[in-house]
């Protein structure tokens, strides 16, 4: 009956109007229709000429009637109202709605994006079943839509243009960055690897995988010189997609080849020897006055993160270098002899000394000032490769917003020198809850990454292989219908202040007492990491701009201490590099008001202490709050004190 009604009401295909379907607790027939307000368009059907009529579903004059159960009064909403006023909880209150407009709080999703989704987000009374040969089942939050894979579908073409670049960029950049982060002990932080987990949006990744061609290959070549040596950087990306009964798998192989083009390729490693940044360069701003007193070696003052029993390489807190503003060698100090010790000073004024000739100190010294720039540039390399790939696939080269700078061979060189010889593999698992109106199920994304290096007569080859497998699996534990929460044990009592409902092999099913959030993704237990941390040689990747950043920060910090805090407020005085300036310069983006929120979120992935309108380096606290501490919601960007905000973001990264 409902099917017949829908067939009778369905307008010509050319108008591309959307039917939003719902069903009640029993067998009551329901339907949903889209209308234009009276006076805008005649009530007659659109003209027969299919090319002369286009329905824009982001038009303010279009509204949707949603019928629920036996209620004959529809809920009328325009698309903009649906996006702005329909929260996820309000949508979920409909319970039996099969498919409706997905809400994406990410400001990069425009009304046009959602309009394209609406062009084919149509379900019938077959429980939103999707034909494998012609449609892909894609989940957006708690919504399942059936996406036709026909290349000549206008909605699919538009959707590909907007979603696919984002998805492939996240897949490639996140997987490479995730692999490096896990491989190198999360760059000295036991928690920072989870920031890379949050970088990959599984739902967007699933969409990109669904739209990705079955086979794709791209090769980029770039010539450069190291002194008088002629070299070439070759970046090759291959994508292979395999569909199976349980889901689909996408394999990406990213290869970096460094080739010497002269001298028959002899001594090709010369092409990887970029001028390093030595400690003397970083420490050239030395204090002339001896106003520092370090009582004795490795003693901290009022700060728990750097105790001798808990060195910075094994700290249990977030990024101990977060608020370092100055590093210098003391002069004529009996407690920290010259040329033997180095002094680290934080924004709060805390200081400590460490031996200059210790490898740990040298690594820390290089990282404390160069880590930020090196990490961003490495990430930008991954983003650049991914975006070049997406641009090639979608033929978007030359269009607005696709201009990409050349790949920095120094970063590839640093990757070559830092990665081990043998193949290493990491395995990560994302669990995504299925919509609550469907049978309780999990959709799982498995991510496997491996790295290998090969040496040839005239070149060195670095290969990073990523395998994404999307599978659907079912469980007898009806956790999702009861809004219970699944977490993995990551060294913290994640069920703190909550009730443990079920526990099996380290996996905990918890119901928080103070929270009603949707299910968060879980992470598979990782292989035990060695206690020693292998550091990338960031000296190889610090660019000239990075040196300027370091100099600016160091100079500003010194002048501020010399002249007082008011010096920073002077109109012509040096200031700490503010967040938007730092991001804008590194990513070559203009920071307008509408995308400030996006940049702020991107920064938070690596700078958990950064405040929206404060200095780049913000004071941190040394204790972890309860993971269930709820942040305020008075503004679009929560601003709880560190580290609760960062931890809250980690637990909620599905929303970003």
From Swiss-Prot:
Residues 1-32 form the signal peptide. The keyword Signal applies. Disulfide bonds: none annotated. GO terms for cellular component: host cell endoplasmic reticulum lumen; viral envelope. Coiled coil: none annotated. It comes from the Viruses. The keyword Glycoprotein applies. Glycosylated by host. One of its GO terms (biological process) is entry receptor-mediated virion attachment to host cell. Glycans are attached at residues 290, 332, 338, 359, 422, 516, 552, 652. Residues 163-185 are annotated as: Interaction with glycoprotein Q2. It is found in: Virion; Host endoplasmic reticulum lumen. Keywords: Glycoprotein, Host endoplasmic reticulum, Host-virus interaction, Late protein, Signal, Viral attachment to host cell, Viral attachment to host entry receptor, Viral envelope protein, Virion, Virus entry into host cell. Interacts with isoform gQ2. The heterodimer gQ1-gQ2 associates with the glycoprotein complex gH-gL to form a tetrameric complex. The gH/gL/gQ1/gQ2 complex binds to human receptor CD46. Plays a role in virus entry by participating in host receptor binding at the cell surface. This is Glycoprotein Q1. The lineage of its organism: Viruses, Duplodnaviria, Heunggongvirae, Peploviricota, Herviviricetes.
